[in-house]
Amino acid sequence: MNELKHLAVVMDGNRRWARAKGFLAKLGYSQGVKTMQKLMEVCMEENISNLSLFAFSTENWKRPKDEIDFIFELLDRCLDEALEKFEKNNVRLRAIGDLSRLEDKVREKITLVEEKTKHCDALCVNLAISYGARDEIIRAAKRVIEKKLELNEENLTQNLDLPLDVDLMLRVGNAKRLSNFLLWQCSYAEIYFSETLFPSLTKREFKRIIKEFRNRERTFGK
């Protein structure tokens, strides 16, 4: 049985879920947050130590301003809730991505939650904000060069935002692509594609996907 330590999820389909039900996109994102909370619960129940969530990509900056503003308003509320609940539930928050593009108040709140939860070890939630895998790799290479280290696989890995291999990449929303998420870390990850839109995912389906992964045969290229 495969051990699942690091689950990465591309949370796609929030807008399509809302449109299909005749709602504004905002409601899709709000429902997506509820699904994200269910996923965190499943990870703790299944002893998964790292959960990486693709919240906002570098490409998402091209979306309409009012949509971007709402996403960050929602993020702000989520961070407030994280301040209240994460430490109590022994959950750590770690933000990855080009955070320099965020407003100061958002960065400050992220730092506050990261600092308050850095000792928590039941689950680490790696929240990808303003994130793109190619951008992460370029920034990691620059760090290696600035430190005057040899540019090799080990040094590049250690200078990534998240130097942790992914075991299972879950892509939801009926799209079969990686969307520039954790490409380096997914070198030998198993991939599961789900047709379900993210807001519609249930704990039962999450657990079924995890069970299917644990029964796969992993060869790591051998």
Swiss-Prot record:
EC nos: 2.5.1.-
Cofactor (UniProt): Mg(2+)
Gene Ontology MF: a single term: magnesium ion binding
Enzyme class: transferase
InterPro entries, sorted: UPP_synth-like, UPP_synth-like_CS, UPP_synth-like_sf
UniProt-annotated catalytic positions: D12, N60 (proton acceptor)
Xref: Gene3D superfamilies: Decaprenyl diphosphate synthase-like
SUPFAM superfamilies named in the record: Undecaprenyl diphosphate synthase
GO biological process assignments: polyprenol biosynthetic process
Keyword annotations of the record: Magnesium, Metal-binding, Transferase
Binding site for Mg(2+): D12, E190
Binding site for substrate: G13, N14, R15, R16, W17, S57, T58, E59, W61, R63, R171, R177, L178, S179
Manner of cofactor binding, per the entry note: Binds 2 magnesium ions per subunit.
Subunit comment: Homodimer.
Record's function text: Catalyzes the condensation of isopentenyl diphosphate (IPP) with allylic pyrophosphates generating different type of terpenoids.
NCBIfam families xref list: uppS (TIGR00055)
Similarity comment: Belongs to the UPP synthase family.
Protein name per Swiss-Prot or TrEMBL: Isoprenyl transferase
Species of provenance: Campylobacter jejuni subsp. jejuni serotype O:2 (strain ATCC 700819 / NCTC 11168)
Lineage: Bacteria, Pseudomonadati, Campylobacterota, Epsilonproteobacteria, Campylobacterales
Gene transcribed to yield this protein: uppS
